[in-house]
Structure formats: structure tokens, C-alpha cells
């Protein structure tokens, strides 16, 4: 993996990560400049997945899919994976468990519409709702929105993990920012969803097991 400001370097690449611009102060690619960059990247390399690594790049995913016609399986964001890792870290502290023993998903839209389905989360192989009390889960829910946006190192690490999983075809579920279809909710928007990956990009969306309350929250989020 290498970084460059030369757009022509994407020719022949197996994956492309869109992160920061070269200007000072450093800012994420977004808005019209970011969309123009995504257009050039997609034109120069018509096969590689394009991963938007930043926390402010939802519009690139949305507009790239809806305006440029790029497949949502090819153009998506990796910042939700950084958020998922941060959530796993605070769950591990609350539960007194190792972070690698935490399995948790994240859905919705940052930062006020973040949904963690605790019923399907696990800690050391046990259901999170069996390990943690209702008070502990409420305390975690109250902290989650403050974890957004993730820092630059967390964002970079998350993007690298998604690329590694995609290229090695590892059967691992990650959180990604995916453009929403009309059947799923409000078209033209994006949402955090669990996905599996392959060298072409997103292999499949993984439907989470949601409680009645979380399903209502998620469906409401997708419609707005």
C-alpha cells in the first residue's frame, strides 16, 4: 500500500483509498473537489474498489453512486469500521474483557443516528445482554455518539483492514458506509451497514438481527 497525490497512479491498482488532500491544513476530499477526484479515479481504473476513508465523505459515496453511476458495491466508506472498533474498545472496558473478544455491529447514520444492536453483540462468546446490565448498556449508548468522528489513525487503520479483508477474501464482517437504494430507504442517502468484502468491493450486505425497538429505529433512520 502506498500514498500519492498523483491520480494517474491508480491505473492498475487493486484498490483505491480516497483520504486527505495535499493542501495545508490537511482536509478530507469532499464536496465538488472530492466528486471530481472520484470521477477521475473511476475513469482511470474501472475495476478496483474505491474506498472513502474519511469521516466527512458521506456525500462522495452518495453522489458518486447517484450522480456518477458508480456501483455502490464498488464505492463505499470505511469510517464506520473505525467507529465499530472504538465501540468495541469501550465495551471491552465496561465488561472487563479483551477487545478481540468483542463482536459488535453498528448501523444508521453518524452521529446522532448510530444504532448498536446489543441483542446480536457478543462478549467472549456470550450475548452482550447477558454479560452487561441494562444500566451498563444505557451508559454505553450515551457514550457512542461522542466517539464520532474517529481520529486520523483510526480512520487509516480501518481503511487498511477493509482492503486486506477484500484482497484476501477473508470471511469477516466489517462496518461500511453504503449508498441506500430505493427499496431500503431514502434514495440518495447513505447508511452504515455490516458487509462482507471481496477483491471487487462489497460482496454482500449482512442483515443484522435486530430487536423490535432497533428495527423501528433503523427503518426510521433509513427513511429520513
Model-derived features: where do they sit?
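Rossmann-fold dinucleotide-binding core
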Residues: 49-126
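Long, compositionally biased stretches enriched for glycine and/or charged residues
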Residues: 96-224
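A generic alpha-helix structural signal
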Residues: 38, 91, 219-222
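N-terminal cationic-hydrophobic initiation segments that often serve targeting/anchoring roles
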Residues: 41-42, 65, 167
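Solvent-exposed alpha-helices and their adjacent loops that cap or buttress functional pockets
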Residues: 8-10, 43-44, 95-97, 185-187
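Rossmann-like NAD(P)-binding element
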Residues: 2-49
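General structural feature for long, well-ordered alpha-helical segments within catalytic domains
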Residues: 33, 37, 60, 83, ...
Amino acid at each position: 500500500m502506498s500514498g500519492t497525490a498523483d491520480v494517474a497512479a491508480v491505473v492498475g491498482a487493486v484498490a483505491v483509498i480516497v483520504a486527505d488532500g495535499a493542501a495545508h491544513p490537511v482536509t478530507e476530499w469532499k464536496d465538488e473537489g472530492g466528486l471530481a477526484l472520484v470521477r477521475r479515479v473511476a475513469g482511470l481504473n474501472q475495476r478496483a474498489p474505491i474506498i472513502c476513508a474519511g469521516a466527512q465523505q458521506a456525500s462522495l459515496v452518495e453522489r458518486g453512486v447517484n450522480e456518477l453511476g458508480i456501483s455502490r458495491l464498488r464505492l463505499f466508506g470505511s469510517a464506520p469500521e473505525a467507529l465499530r472498533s472504538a465501540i468495541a474498545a469501550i465495551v471491552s472496558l465496561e465488561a472487563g474483557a479483551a477487545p478481540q473478544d468483542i463482536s459488535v455491529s453498528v448501523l444508521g447514520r453518524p452521529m446522532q443516528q448510530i444504532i448498536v444492536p446489543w441483542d446480536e453483540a457478543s462478549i467472549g462468546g456470550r450475548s452482550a445482554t447477558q454479560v452487561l446490565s441494562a444500566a451498563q448498556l444505557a451508559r454505553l449508548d450515551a457514550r457512542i455518539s461522542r466517539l464520532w468522528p474517529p481520529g486520523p489513525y483510526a480512520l487509516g487503520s480501518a481503511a487498511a483492514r477493509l482492503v486486506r479483508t477484500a484482497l484476501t477474501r477473508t470471511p469477516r464482517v466489517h462496518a461500511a458506509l453504503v449508498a441506500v437504494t430505493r427499496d431500503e430507504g431514502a434514495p440518495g442517502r447513505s447508511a452504515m451497514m455490516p458487509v462482507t468484502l471481496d477483491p471487487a468491493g462489497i460482496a454482500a450486505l449482512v442483515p443484522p438481527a435486530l430487536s423490535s425497538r432497533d428495527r423501528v429505529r433503523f427503518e426510521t433512520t433509513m427513511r429520513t
